């Protein structure tokens, strides 16, 4: 079985350089802001996006050229800090108290401060990119911010209208997850001077990984515990219709579907409805749908 550590191994040295780079560039004056920023940076998870940048750069660098240079570290930083800011904003929107097994930024410092520190990270990130003079990298990455916002609005609209379809679900996870991972892969290629054709291939590869990653993550939300860093059934509590529940809704009749949707609407207030839907999904849903 291929593990994340095995995938990470070829760029371990570059990842260490990236950590030093990001810590050096993201500092702040003021005790509260500095504390919040350090807290956000210390719980960034597995680092899938910067690792993707570095692996793509290593794959596409010309023979004899160092793939982990300043442009590559900058590209990795740009995508990672967009991701960090988006998670802070997501937790505010979803009123989530936990992030990766500990209190979220909004739970610890209130939502009003969390929104500002998320904005600060985005502003600091763009300032870093522009001052570097690497305008091609900044332009390449910036579009992902708008795409993330589009995905969030679409998800909220579909949830409020109870109109989630498989097509809209796939569109949402592309915009909220796969797009930035795709940009990470293509940014790594761009950083080392790869052709546009290779950049496009790397982006498609990254997007495919991102789609698979998010589908698996949505499945795990019905089974994992807080030990893994996110409460089980969190999507239900936030009224999010992801692939497991969507598959069940597609498989039942209209009357039964309305009943399940009514249960979903009460999940934020009722643990009983959460447990009921979790049981139904686990009973009727199999990993065959994810494979499809």
Can you name each region flagged by the protein language model?
Residues 1-21:
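N-terminal amphipathic/basic leader segments beginning at the initiator methionine
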Residues 3, 69, 165, 266-273:
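A diffuse structural propensity rather than consistent per-protein peaks
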Residues 6, 10, 43, 172-175, ...:
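Short, surface-exposed alpha-helical recognition segments that flank or form part
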Residues 16-17, 23-257:
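Mg2+-dependent prenyl diphosphate-binding active-site environment of isoprenoid biosynthetic enzymes
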Residues 252-266, 271-279, 283:
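Gly/Pro-rich interdomain helix-loop hinge
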Residues 285-292:
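Conserved small/polar residues in nucleotide/adenosyl-binding loops
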């Amino acid at each position: 079985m291929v593990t994340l550590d095995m995938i990470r191994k070829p760029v371990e040295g570059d990842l260490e350089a990236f950590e030093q780079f990001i810590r050096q560039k993201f500092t702040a004056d003021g005790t509260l802001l500095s504390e919040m920023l350090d807290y956000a940076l210390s719980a960034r998870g597995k680092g899938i996006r910067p690792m993707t940048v570095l692996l793509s750069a290593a794959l596409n660098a010309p023979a004899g050229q160092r793939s982990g240079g300043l442009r590559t570290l900058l590209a990795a930083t740009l995508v990672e800090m967009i991701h960090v800011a988006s998670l802070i904003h997501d937790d505010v929107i979803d009123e989530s108290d936990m992030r990766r097994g500990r209190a979220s930024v909004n739970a610890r410092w209130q939502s009003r401060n969390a929104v500002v520190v998320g904005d600060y990270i985005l502003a600091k990130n763009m300032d870093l990119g522009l001052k570097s003079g690497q305008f091609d990298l900044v332009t390449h990455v910036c579009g992902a911010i708008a795409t993330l916002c589009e995905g969030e609005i679409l998800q909220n609209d579909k949830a409020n209208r109870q109109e989630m379809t498989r097509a809209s679900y796939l569109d949402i996870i592309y915009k909220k997850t796969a797009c930035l991972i795709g940009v990470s892969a293509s940014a790594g290629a761009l950083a080392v001077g790869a052709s546009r054709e290779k950049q496009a291939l790397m982006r498609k590869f990254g997007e495919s990984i991102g789609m698979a990653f998010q589908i698996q993550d949505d499945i795990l939300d019905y089974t994992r515990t807080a030990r893994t860093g996110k409460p089980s059934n969190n999507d239900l509590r936030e009224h999010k219709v992801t692939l497991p529940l969507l598959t069940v809704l597609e498989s039942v009749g209209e009357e039964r579907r309305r009943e399940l949707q009514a249960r979903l609407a009460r999940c934020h207030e009722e643990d009983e409805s959460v447990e009921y839907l979790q049981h139904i999904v686990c009973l009727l849903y199999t990993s065959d749908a994810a494979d499809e």
